[in-house]
Design a protein with these regions (language model features):
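Acidic, metal-coordinating helix/loop segments flanking the phosphotransfer/catalytic sites
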Residues: 52-70
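CheY-like receiver
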Residues: 144-166
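Charged docking surfaces used in two-component/phosphorelay signaling
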Residues: 38-42
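Receiver (REC) domain active-site loop signature in two-component systems and cognate sites
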Residues: 77
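C-terminal output helix
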Residues: 128-137, 141, 149
Length: 166
């Protein structure tokens, strides 16, 4: 398949916002490398409805218009890099809850700390194992589902229920 052609139609081909029961969670993969986008899409398309963006600006557009369950983003990209995207996601109440994984070739401690300080849930270094990335996604999705269940049963939980663990 021609990745450029599939990327051009990605925004218009997405299903509507509501997800029917049993629908796959939608994974947003953001990377300026077309080969990496295709690799991640083919690696995760059995489990997720994978949509792609080539930079942070495209990713924000997808987030504004579609229900996204998790984000995997490269760090170094043009227009808006992964750290800037993560900060924008965490700063927007509409999607600040979405699990966010930075996937990058940058292995220095400064980059790792910057990635975690911007609000990323995981910082995964390239080269990486798709099994490890899948475990990270599964862990984040499970925790999110557990949190949603807890607050659906106790919608008016006291603020102490949200308190950080010491």
């Amino acid at each position: 398949a021609d990745i450029a052609a599939s990327h051009e139609t990605a925004l218009s081909d997405l299903p509507p916002m509501h997800k029917p029961e049993g629908a796959k969670p939608r994974l947003l993969v953001v990377d300026d490398n077309e080969d990496m986008l295709q690799f991640l899409k083919s690696s995760f398309e059995e489990t997720y409805d994978v949509v792609t963006a080539t930079n942070g600006m495209e990713a924000l557009s997808l987030l504004e218009n579609h229900q996204i369950s998790a984000i995997v983003s490269d760090l170094m990209m043009p227009k808006m890099n992964g750290v800037e995207l993560c900060r924008a996601v965490r700063g927007n109440q509409s999607f600040s809850h979405i699990p966010f994984i930075l996937l990058t070739a940058k292995t220095d401690n400064f980059s790792k700390i910057e990635g975690m300080n911007c609000g990323a849930d995981y910082y995964v270094e390239k080269p990486f194992s798709t099994h490890f990335l899948d475990a990270c996604l599964t862990n984040l999705m499970t925790r999110r589902k557990q949190l949603a269940q807890k607050f659906s049963q106790e919608p008016l939980a006291p603020p102490t229920a949200l308190a950080a663990t010491p």
